[in-house]
Amino acid sequence: MNIAEYHQNIEQVWLQIEEQLEEQGCDVDCDTQGSVFTITFADRSQIVVNKQEPLLELWLASKAGGFHFAFKNNQWIAQDGKLFWQCLEQACLAHGEQVNFS
């Protein structure tokens, strides 16, 4: 994957997150600032999904933990085999919102 494809892929992920949160009626605010996408929950807690361009990785940080994902076989996968969408669902649940990104 080249740099342009990397950015396009992550921006598509961000769009999908925002659309799913809105469609499922979650009480959150989403914001993008440069390479950082932030989901802010009603209690002001946050999930941060950000680009790590030098590594071509996608990072996820929340009170559920921090994860680094590489794009393999058309999906974002952590070194331990966890899938990005599953980790994001678990992170949202830890912040009080049940969301299905599948």
Swiss-Prot record:
UniProt xrefs under Pfam families: Frataxin_Cyay
Family annotation (CDD domains): Frataxin
SMART domains: Frataxin_Cyay (SM01219)
Transmembrane portions of the chain: none
UniProt xrefs under InterPro entries: CyaY, Frataxin/CyaY, Frataxin/CyaY_sf, Frataxin_CS
Cellular component, GO annotation: cytosol
Family: Belongs to the frataxin family.
Chain's role: Involved in iron-sulfur (Fe-S) cluster assembly. May act as a regulator of Fe-S biogenesis.
NCBIfam families reported in the protein's UniProt record: FeS_CyaY
Name this polypeptide is given: Iron-sulfur cluster assembly protein CyaY
Encoding gene, per UniProt annotation: cyaY
